[in-house]
Amino acid sequence: MLDAFSRVVTGADSKAAYVGGADLQALKKFVSEGNKRLDAVNAIVSNASCIVSDAVSGMICENPSLISPSGECYTNRRMAACLRDAEIILRYVSYSLLSGDSSVLEDRCLSGLKETYASLGVPAAGNARAVGIMKATVVAFINNTSNQKKLLTPSGDCSALASEAAGYFDKVTSALA
């Protein structure tokens, strides 16, 4: 995982050049937006258990057969695994949002995710729906339009940051498809 600074330095070093021009301007923007980024990640972390449980509950409400005796969330163990998996996905999305880089999400969470679920017989559609619910909730927190927040959320125009977070969730959904 390379953060924004490491990516710029690595790129400049590979060219045997100084950091400057557009790279320097991009870093200046990254720093100036830093407090919004930190506030957004803090909003996700502070509300993580609610985000995850609401997403899994929403998935089950839309597909009650998941908790029937033959359903994928029927036993406590399976429900706990579902909640755990959603929490892991949300955690890696928050890491990506913090660093401004999706490589940690792709390398440590998404690589082989579809194959793992397929081998366990876990339907991708339900997981994708839970990810979609988490995406909507996180975007609402970042845009300060959620009515369920525990702490203050980022102030000012955070639409670019919300779009970035949505993109990370879209990567997860694509990996499940």
From Swiss-Prot:
- Keyword annotations for this protein? Bile pigment, Chloroplast, Chromophore, Electron transport, Membrane, Photosynthesis, Plastid, Thylakoid, Transport
Keyword Protease annotated = no
List positions binding (2R,3E)-phycocyanobilin 1. K28, N35, D39, P154, G156, C158
- Give the main localization category: plastid
Q: Give the membrane topology.
A: Peripheral membrane protein
Recorded GO CC terms: chloroplast thylakoid membrane; phycobilisome
What biological process terms from GO does the record include?
A: photosynthesis
PTM summary: Contains two phycocyanobilin chromophores, one mesobiliverdin chromophore and one 15,16-dihydrobiliverdin chromophore with binding mediated by both the alpha and beta subunits.
Q: Which CDD domains match?
A: PE_beta-like (cd14767)
- What does the entry list as the binding residues for mesobiliverdin? Y18
SUPFAM superfamilies assigned: Globin-like (SSF46458)
Q: Where in the cell is it found?
A: Plastid, Chloroplast thylakoid membrane
Residues passing through the membrane, by range: none
Q: Which Pfam families match?
A: Phycobilisome
Q: Do the record's keywords include Coiled coil?
A: no
Q: Which InterPro entries match?
A: Globin-like_sf, Phycobilisome_asu/bsu, Phycobilisome_asu/bsu_sf
**Where is 15,16-dihydrobiliverdin bound in this sequence?**
C50, D54, C61, Q148
* Additional remark text: The light-harvesting system in Cryptophytes contains phycobiliprotein complexes. Unusually they are composed of either phycoerythrin (CPE) or phycocyanin (CPC) but never allophycocyanin (APC), with only one type of biliprotein being present in any one species. Unlike cyanobacteria or red algae these proteins are not arranged into higher-order phycobilisome complexes, and they are found in the thylakoid lumen.
Question: What PANTHER family would the database entry show?
Answer: C-PHYCOCYANIN BETA SUBUNIT, PHYCOBILISOME 32.1 KDA LINKER POLYPEPTIDE, PHYCOCYANIN-ASSOCIATED, ROD 2-RELATED
What does the sequence similarity comment in the record state about its family? Belongs to the phycobiliprotein family.
Assembly notes: Heterotetramer of 2 different alpha chains and 2 identical beta chains which form 2 alpha-beta heterodimers within the heterotetramer.
Q: What is this protein called?
A: Phycocyanin-645 beta chain
The species this protein was found in = Chroomonas sp
Taxonomy, top ranks, is:
Eukaryota, Cryptophyceae, Pyrenomonadales, Chroomonadaceae, Chroomonas
